């Protein structure tokens, strides 16, 4: 089964909170320090248990000689560095951590570049350029490796609200660079919490380390809490669940419209355009409408983010002038593709699991079709050969 980490950022996310969460979930601090020592930077990880509104959490501070760490959700005033300096430091890490950490700072540079109108090479990092952020981002990547996490899921992110003071003045929450990084990520702005809950470092962790946003079906092994610095109206902690994927639950939408006055030749093109735009599924259902008029119900499954784009295509490429939108929860069983050796050669087979049991085995159609044509045997014989072989090794799939 696939080992996953599910993040519940009900109080946002910052670099130190993520590090605290990883340690709380079982990362060995000494091994983490050992891996990060390759950066060639002198630092100390101060780790302690704290209480946030009745919740015990792990607090991690990155401390440098002569300088106290003070990252929190509020303060943005850190010393600055340019991207080239940071890249030279990160190059000392071992792969795959090196590759991912450098990608994360590239992403940060692009966000800052867009906000300030500068080439990314000339961006002067503030909160994200401080050496503690370098340690936090490198530590985030290394920590996930140490936990053996294969995929990271995340729920909707609370950004907080109000204004934050920066070197450039008072900015609305989320700050501009953070907002840029949060594009495509499901967020909500809690008006009851007048504080910055997501820092740029936290935002880039979400952007680059989270594989999917949505609620997975998982078997929980551990629950951990990483603490932030300031005290808020709510517990200032990042909660995470470490466990194994049993299935996946996604929040999708179903768009439907009934069409009774369109040239049938246009339906094929409409389907192509909907898939090109990002539809997850498109299907047509013959129906009878009022006055016994034959029609076609067009159904489109897509993500919430694609809704407006799908509706635009639907209205432009069909005669529809209205549509129904339904919010759905879709559950997927985890699956993997294995290769099965038969008398006709190797054939890819999709195996689905639920509750740790194999619930479905499906040979890949296109591969079976190709072999059937090449060997000049019935397609059903290829399928039968696969099923015979699978029955012999059923306990090993």
From Swiss-Prot:
Name assigned to this protein: Pyridinium-3,5-bisthiocarboxylic acid mononucleotide nickel insertion protein
GO terms, biological process: protein maturation
S-S bonds: none
Reaction it catalyzes: Ni(II)-pyridinium-3,5-bisthiocarboxylate mononucleotide = pyridinium-3,5-bisthiocarboxylate mononucleotide + Ni(2+)
Functional note: Involved in the biosynthesis of a nickel-pincer cofactor ((SCS)Ni(II) pincer complex). Binds Ni(2+), and functions in nickel delivery to pyridinium-3,5-bisthiocarboxylic acid mononucleotide (P2TMN), to form the mature cofactor. Is thus probably required for the activation of nickel-pincer cofactor-dependent enzymes.
Pfam families for this protein: Ni_insertion
Organism: Thermotoga petrophila (strain ATCC BAA-488 / DSM 13995 / JCM 10881 / RKU-1)
Class in the EC hierarchy, top level: lyase
Top-level lineage group: Bacteria
Keywords in alphabetical order: Lyase, Nickel
Family: Belongs to the LarC family.
């Amino acid at each position: 089964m696939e080992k996953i980490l599910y993040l519940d950022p009900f109080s946002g996310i910052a670099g130190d909170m993520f590090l605290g969460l990883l340690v709380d979930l079982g990362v060995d601090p000494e091994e983490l320090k050992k891996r990060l020592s390759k950066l060639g930077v002198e630092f100390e990880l101060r780790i302690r248990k704290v209480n946030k509104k009745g919740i015990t959490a792990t607090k991690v501070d990155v401390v440098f000689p002569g300088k106290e760490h003070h990252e929190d959700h509020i303060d943005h005033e850190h010393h600055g560095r340019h991207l080239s300096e940071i890249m030279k430091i990160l190059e000392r890490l071992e792969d795959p951590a090196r590759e991912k950490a450098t990608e994360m700072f590239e992403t940060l540079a692009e966000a800052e570049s867009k906000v300030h109108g500068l080439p990314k090479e000339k961006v002067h990092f503030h909160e994200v350029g401080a050496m503690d952020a370098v340690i936090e981002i490198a530590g985030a990547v290394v920590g996930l490796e140490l936990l053996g996490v294969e995929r990271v899921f995340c729920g909707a992110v609370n950004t907080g609200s109000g204004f934050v003071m920066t070197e450039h003045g008072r900015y609305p929450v989320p700050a501009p660079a953070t907002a840029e990084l949060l594009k495509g990520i499901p967020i909500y702005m809690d008006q009851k919490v007048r504080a910055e809950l997501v820092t740029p470092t936290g935002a880039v962790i979400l952007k680059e380390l989270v594989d999917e946003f949505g609620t997975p079906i998982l078997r929980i092994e551990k629950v951990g809490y990483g603490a932030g610095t300031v005290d808020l109206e709510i517990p200032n902690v990042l909660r995470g669940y470490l466990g194994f994927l049993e299935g996946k639950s996604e929040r999708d939408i179903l768009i439907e419209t009934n069409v009774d006055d369109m040239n049938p030749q246009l339906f094929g093109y409409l389907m192509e355009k909907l898939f090109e735009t990002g539809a997850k599924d498109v299907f047509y259902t013959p129906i009878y409408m009022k006055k016994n008029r034959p029609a076609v119900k067009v159904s489109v499954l897509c993500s919430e983010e694609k809704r407006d784009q799908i509706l635009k295509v639907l209205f432009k490429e069909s005669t529809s002038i209205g549509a129904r939108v339904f919010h759905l929860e879709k559950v997927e069983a985890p699956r993997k593709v294995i290769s099965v050796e038969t008398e006709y050669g190797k054939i890819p087979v999709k195996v689905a699991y639920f509750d740790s049991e194999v619930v479905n085995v499906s040979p890949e159609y296109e591969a079976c079709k190709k072999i059937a044509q090449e060997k000049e045997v019935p397609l059903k014989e290829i399928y039968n050969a696969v099923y015979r072989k699978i029955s012999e090794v059923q306990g090993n799939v």
